[in-house]
């Protein structure tokens, strides 16, 4: 499934990104995280940098952005990219998002599993991710899928105090 254009499930498809998707990813992260957590434009700017870096450095052999949709409606997304800061053969899971209307049907789990399968298929040794302690649903899924919390650190990247978390899964 890692290299295919679209992977079908019972109620949604996972497809590779197309032109225009990065703008949608930035928009939905900005709007949704503002509504649910009160996060500001600094978060939206961070997401914009991640998506711009994805486009600038995209290596289709080792990286993917999957879009989940149903009947053309955006339901969620996730990225798997090379961990360019690492000296080992690691990947990073980035920008997992599931729309409120698509929660509770296994979409988040499907997106994470798609990353894991692809990472194994292309030979990564581990997947790392960074999240925040306030994102309980995502943290629950990461734990269920085999990720281990390896480090926490308080930060103010968004202009207020949060606890960042580094998670990792060995493949």
Predicted regions, residues:
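C-terminal "cap" of GNAT-fold acetyltransferases
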Residues: 125-171
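Generic serine detector
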Residues: 10-11, 86, 101, 125, ...
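Acetyl-CoA-dependent GNAT
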Residues: 16-101, 109-114, 118, 122, ...
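Residue-level signal for beta-strand positions within conserved beta-sheet cores that form or flank
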Residues: 10, 76, 89, 125, ...
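Conserved N-terminal entry element of GNAT/NAT acetyltransferase domains
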Residues: 1-23
């Amino acid at each position: 499934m890692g290299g295919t254009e679209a992977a079908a499930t019972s109620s949604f498809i996972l497809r590779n990104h197309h032109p225009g998707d990065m703008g949608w990813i930035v928009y939905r992260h900005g709007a949704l995280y503002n509504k649910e957590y009160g996060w500001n434009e600094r978060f939206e700017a961070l997401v914009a940098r991640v998506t711009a870096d994805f486009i600038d450095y995209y290596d289709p052999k080792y990286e993917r952005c999957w879009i989940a949709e149903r009947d053309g409606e955006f339901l969620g997304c996730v990225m798997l990219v090379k961990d360019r800061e690492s000296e080992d053969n690691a990947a990073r899971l980035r920008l997992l998002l599931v729309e409120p209307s698509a929660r509770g049907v296994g979409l988040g789990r499907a997106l994470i599993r798609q990353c894991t399968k692809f990472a194994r298929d292309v030979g990564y040794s581990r997947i790392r991710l960074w999240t925040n302690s306030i994102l309980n649903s995502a943290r629950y899924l990461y734990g269920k899928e085999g990720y281990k919390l390896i480090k926490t650190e308080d930060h103010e990247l968004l202009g207020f105090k949060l606890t960042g978390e580094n998670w990792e899964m060995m493949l």
